[in-house]
Amino acid sequence: MNKITLFPCAKINLGLNITRKRSDGYHDLETVFCPVPIADILTIEKNGKPAGCSLKTNGIVIDGRAEDNIIVKAYDEMARRHTLTGVDITITKNIPIQAGMGGGSADCAFTIKGLNQLFSLNLTDGEMRDIAKGLGADCAFFINPTPAYATGIGEKLTPVDIPLDNHWIVIVKTDTAVSTREAFAGICPHEPERNCRDIVTSLPPREWKDVLYNDFEETIFKLHPTLAEIKQRLYEAGACYACMSGSGSAVVGLFDDRPSVESTDRLRSDYNALVATFKLGRQKDNAFELLPLVDAEGRVTGKTTRSMAHCGTKLLHPVVHLHVFDTHGNLYLQKRPAWKDIQPDRWDTAVGGHIGYGESVEELQRETREEISIADFSAEKIDAYVFESRYEREYVNVFKTVYDKEIRPSENELDGGRFWSRDEILSSIGKGVFTPNFESEYVKYFK
């Protein structure tokens, strides 16, 4: 193996109590760390040099010299302990900086994990956590980022079971920057009446509001009242629980159901903020599938993950749509399954899928095999256009083909499919039967 790509995820804090100031100047705390799907993209590649690490950054701008970056420090520490050759590291930053979401710590931990795999060091999670602890207080959490109760300075971790599967989370990050010094300036260490672990494991999220606190909020909200406003706005939008994450400045809201697009759009426009919406828990779609980013002409400009493309950021990414007709003019449509986050239980274009990073539009056959199990066909490209829904922006490459053989829809990806006559389609348009995207394409190209 010469190259590896990983996806360092962010975390949020569910409750945070500062319990003691230590003689070494650090503070003991207790909190619950919970991973969330927003993630950076980390690529580590051997470069043939005897030693050393180069770092290239994309996405959110990282200030400072490369040699001071915690990723480089992680490489240096691993090289001090083990025999490593030179590597080139590229990090695409999606996790907001100065947000209280652990982006730098995640990058550090995943660098350790990536080097362990790339150089076949066979380190255990415990050994990697020991290395990570020396580089940052909460770095150890990201070696195996599952919900955990954290004590000490954040390095002592105990797994916890949190009832958040199928909840939705909204993350709001303004350009407000909170320094560690100002965050701790107003803190009076104390032992809470009830610790965070007991609260999140014994009560449903809707009952956390009046018992699960972040000690930093009192100080930070006075200095930055906009953050307090955002927290209140999340409750008004229907959140069952809202809080600032860590020492800020990201504010997060948990929802029983997907929040309205109108409420998240207003937060985005009113505060000029990054607003990202995710569903928590294991999903059938691969949240970390790599997708290309493109401009309005379809030219590749970068890359992102599926979760980032679908969380409301409106990052423009390419897809392919294939309309499959039979020789009688009937059109095959697929039924989207109920578990899909976008347009569940609606009929849609026969084949619709993402173009993976590094793939070309012409690799339509892969998506077609996956969805409806046909490969021996030739497709005609009709058009390409930008489609914007309430949740995402897609650069749609439209194809059509004629096919009379058996079609077998994927049981894993679809809820069936069948041919529809022209009259059937026209009589059902506008009645909630089809996806809006299919309706607009059919009317434009085939009506």
Regions found by a protein language model. Give the residues of each.
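Active-site segment of metal-dependent pyrophosphate-handling enzymes
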Residues: 328, 338, 360-361, 369-406
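Nudix hydrolase/Nudix homology domain
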Residues: 345, 383-386, 390-447
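Conserved, helical-rich catalytic subdomain that frames metal- and/or nucleotide-binding sites
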Residues: 144-145, 149-241, 256-259, 271, ...
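ATP-binding N-lobe of GHMP and related small-molecule kinases
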Residues: 1-99, 117-126, 161-165, 173, ...
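Contiguous, small/hydrophobic- and glycine-enriched helical/loop subdomains that border
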Residues: 108, 112-149
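Acidic, metal-coordinating catalytic segment for phosphate/diphosphate chemistry
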Residues: 286-321, 327
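Glycine/serine-rich anion-binding loops at beta->alpha junctions
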Residues: 90-119, 137, 240-252
